[in-house]
A protein has these predicted regions:
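Glycine-rich phosphate/diphosphate-binding loops that line cofactor/substrate pockets in enzymes
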Residues: 40-52
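A ubiquitous structural signal for well-ordered alpha-helices
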Residues: 29, 33, 45-48, 118
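Short, flexible segments with low predicted structural confidence
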Residues: 19-21, 45-46, 93-94
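HTH-adjacent hinge/linker in prokaryotic transcriptional regulators
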Residues: 1-41
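Glycine-rich phosphate-binding loops that contact phosphosugars or nucleotide phosphates
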Residues: 50-172
């Protein structure tokens, strides 16, 4: 039986079955994410993060809280992280960025300004970019400097919730 990442639970299941299905979703997600990891990329990103004076994390909607958690964790070790939330702040911080910043863009498939506008601004000001996305997504006009992949098995337009994607992002951050 194939696991359905879009609808891991249904209304006719018992509480026990729901708990087991969510557990299975999370276990499969962690395994898939670990299998997509490039240790080489991870090493290079860690080095770029250490070198950067400021890290800027760009994301949207449900992933904002993960970015804020990452910001908190990095601040505990003395690293400055910006998490601009609205589009105006994102554009402003991207435009004032430079090669001393490191931009992390988190997007499943590049919706909204994360797909085209911000990457172009960051590329123009020579800010190194880490893209955290599904396996089959990258920028249109150029490649990111670094890329890590999240579990690609959710349909982002037809699903019960982003259980898999959000756990994958949390695991990476």
């Amino acid at each position: 039986e194939n696991f359905n990442f879009d609808f891991p639970v249904n209304q006719f299941q018992t509480h026990y079955e729901i708990i087991q299905k969510i557990k299975e979703d999370y276990e499969q997600t962690l395994n898939l994410t670990a299998n997509l990891f490039s240790l080489d990329q991870l090493r290079l990103i860690a080095s770029a993060m250490k070198k950067a004076q400021i890290i800027d994390v760009y994301t949207s909607a449900g992933n904002i809280n993960f970015a804020l958690n990452f910001q908190f964790q990095m601040q505990e070790i003395g690293k400055q992280v910006n998490v601009p939330i609205d589009e105006y702040q994102q554009r402003l911080i991207a435009a004032s960025s430079d090669e001393n910043h490191l931009a992390i863009i988190i997007t499943f498939g590049g919706r909204g300004i994360l797909s085209d506008i911000l990457p172009r601004i960051l590329h123009k000001v020579k800010t190194p970019i880490v893209l955290i996305s599904s396996y089959d997504y990258t920028f249109k006009d150029f490649d990111p400097d670094y890329q890590l992949y999240i579990s690609p098995y959710e349909n982002h337009y037809k699903k019960i919730s982003s259980f898999s994607t959000r756990l994958s992002i949390l695991y990476i951050l």
